[in-house]
Swiss-Prot record:
InterPro entries: Collagen, Collagen/C1q_domain, EMI_domain. Homo- or heteromers. This is EMI domain-containing protein 1. Pfam families: Collagen, EMI. Keywords: Collagen, Disulfide bond, Extracellular matrix, Glycoprotein, Secreted, Signal. Residues 163-184, 222-231, 244-264, 292-311 have a biased composition (Pro residues). Residues 1-22 form the signal peptide.
Amino acid sequence: MGGPRAWALLCLGLLLPGGGAAWSIGAAPFSGRRNWCSYVVTRTISCHVQNGTYLQRVLQNCPWPMSCPGSSYRTVVRPTYKVMYKIVTAREWRCCPGHSGVSCEEASSASLEPMWSGSTMRRMALRPTAFSGCLNCSKVSELTERLKVLEAKMTMLTVIEQPVPPTPATPEDPAPLWGPPPAQGSPGDGGLQDQVGAWGLPGPTGPKGDAGSRGPMGMRGPPGPQGPPGSPGRAGAVGTPGERGPPGPPGPPGPPGPPAPVGPPHARISQHGDPLLSNTFTETNNHWPQGPTGPPGPPGPMGPPGPPGPTGVPGSPGHIGPPGPTGPKGISGHPGEKGERGLRGEPGPQGSAGQRGEPGPKGDPGEKSHWGEGLHQLREALKILAERVLILETMIGLYEPELGSGAGPAGTGTPSLLRGKRGGHATNYRIVAPRSRDERG
């Protein structure tokens, strides 16, 4: 994109006296501003970043004018926040080496004009260093500086070159105009409107953060003392009746009963038998014919039992009868009183050793430590950052010899690297290296 005229103007600017010094507008009242130099400072700030959500129980108010019998709750999804630490780089203006004071006008007597330039400082940071492979926090600053240089180079490559007015005295061939690269000095003197204003009033206090998350559950406490014995239980239900027992032996004979009353006259006929059957007739004085025999009368009461007869010959033993049916279960009685405790028995002989049991199931895996996981993620991030920095340096060609240094042929290097706008300010970039700890807001 750069033509021969642009290269010629650049070489003429280098040949002018004071070309490697700081830029200056030339105004006498602001000549002290050339002693100011820019420095890159790094700060670590904290910020809240949302990290998931959690459920929160919120008490609902009673919609009725009267008091409600119970409390009601509703579940609300609340965001969870954590604190992230960011490393922010900023540019500050301070006195150049050899100058001091409020306006950087006092020069030290023992110090001379500084011999370094902006390109020299960048050249010191562009030297590749051997990566040791130890991804710890000591390499963060080195990677940050290298990445910062890469971003500055990329910004210069993407800047659109503004048209340069034609200069008739410039040669067409830029090859003979070799020389050291131009040095970028400190920014030029600013006008009155560029003076730093007074600090403003502090801002209002921010809103109160959300309540923190609930802490982890505590450890289980020791078991409490044994309580007093409980009251005795109620009496049990009545059991089913028991089986029916066998029949008892016959009882002894009872005493003789009272004598029976005398029966009717026809009862005495039965003692001598029926006259028709026994061939006996009763003489009667009347000659009337005998009528039919009436129905028999009711049986008389049982007479007294006779005396017991002699004991008979004992009979042969009978066959054993089948067992009777099982009777219903009897009612269970009340439990008796608890007896006294017996004497302790002698210990028995020691038994033989049993067989070895099967191994138990494998336990659950333990929880991983949060510190180890975060350290591993930090190492992976540093490793990826180091690889990307090396790839970018290789693609841009930062380690090729500079134009005019004599280490390479003419025309090498990237001409558009030096297209920085004179008097312009470089864009501030921030490099973030997260280092978090969880917090709920």
